[in-house]
Swiss-Prot record:
Keywords: Cell membrane, G-protein coupled receptor, Membrane, Receptor, Transducer, Transmembrane, Transmembrane helix. GO terms for molecular function: G protein-coupled receptor activity. Residues 1-13, 64-78, 142-163, 217-221 are extracellular. The chain crosses the membrane at residues 14-34, 43-63, 79-99, 121-141, 164-184, 196-216, 222-242. PANTHER family: MAS-RELATED G-PROTEIN COUPLED RECEPTOR, MAS-RELATED G-PROTEIN COUPLED RECEPTOR MEMBER G. This is Mas-related G-protein coupled receptor member G. Orphan receptor. May regulate nociceptor function and/or development, including the sensation or modulation of pain. GO terms for cellular component: plasma membrane.
């Protein structure tokens, strides 16, 4: 019995410090992406999504690191920590779904997309993503007693079911758009495979393997804490990997082998020349994106 308890304590400590290490590196990478996309690269329709996605990941990782330090110092974890960190994770999920769907539509219907898409559609959609997500997480958390000591038995199930259903639908929409894009680019499209296509698929693979455990934990938190307590620290670690790895994907796809370049050039190449053309109001050459 004591051996199992000691083994669990060791495992929990190892995962905790791994999460802290990953979380410390993630804000640096996402901060560099934020700086370059926000101030050094002309904003195009897809770079705006990546800018907001980097902001959501930066906030998630910063909160995660701050709360981990507080947990280590105080020796206890408040449910408020999970609610606030999951809030920024949820914003990232919304943004990734919108980004994947728009990237898919731009490849399936390029002529219609270029002619009918409003110039500031990406900025408007990102603003619409942030606005409803901010209450979408705290409301069910408050009703179910995660933000206070008492729960509302009549209201909690309805809020929780609606929240869980919505997040699972978003994950499915993002993944479906990615699968359609993969099949189209691989089997049907005659144009060269774009780098931005790799960003979409890389982000969706991260979501599937590293992000969905957090959605499941949000959905089944009391049950998982009782039946599988190991799930919570692992889901937290994987969520940090999900948010920290996206800058590495951008860098890997945009960097030329054997050359040392500033991050601005790497990001511009990963996004494609169409990002700059779109920012000047010209038509988007979708084959370049």
């Amino acid at each position: 019995m004591f051996g199992l308890f000691g083994l669990w304590r060791t495992f929990d400590s190892v995962v905790f410090y791994l999460t802290l290490i990953v979380g410390l590196g993630g804000p640096v990478g996402n901060g560099l992406v934020l700086w370059n996309l926000g101030f050094r690269i002309k904003k195009g329709p897809f770079s705006i999504y990546l800018l907001h996605l980097a902001a959501a990941d930066f906030l998630f990782l910063s909160c995660r690191v701050g709360f981990s330090v507080a947990q280590a110092a105080l020796g206890a974890q408040d449910t408020l920590y999970f609610v606030l960190t999951f809030l920024w994770f949820a914003v990232g999920l919304w943004l990734l779904a919108a980004f994947s769907v728009e990237r898919c539509l731009s490849d399936l219907f390029p002529a219609c997309y270029q002619g009918c898409r409003p110039r500031h559609a990406s900025a408007v959609l990102c603003a619409l993503v942030w606005t409803p997500t901010l209450p979408a997480v705290p409301l069910p958390a408050n009703a179910c007693g995660l933000l206070r000591n008492s729960a509302c038995p009549l209201v909690c199930p309805r809020y929780h079911v609606a929240s869980v259903t919505w997040f699972l639908v978003l994950a499915r929409v993002a993944w479906t758009a990615g699968v359609v894009l993969f099949v189209w680019v691989t089997c049907c499209s005659t144009r060269p495979r774009p780098r931005l296509y790799g960003i979409v698929l890389g982000a969706l693979l991260l979501l599937f393997f590293c992000g969905l455990p957090s959605v499941f934990y949000w959905s089944l938190q009391p049950l998982l804490n009782f039946l599988l307590p190991v799930f919570s620290p692992l889901a937290t670690l994987l969520a940090c990997v999900n948010s920290s790895s996206k800058p590495l994907i951008y860098s890997g796809l945009g960097r030329q082998p054997g050359k040392r370049e500033p991050l601005r050039s790497v990001l511009r190449r990963a996004l494609g020349e169409g990002a700059e053309l779109g920012a000047r109001g010209q038509s988007l050459p979708m084959g370049l994106l």
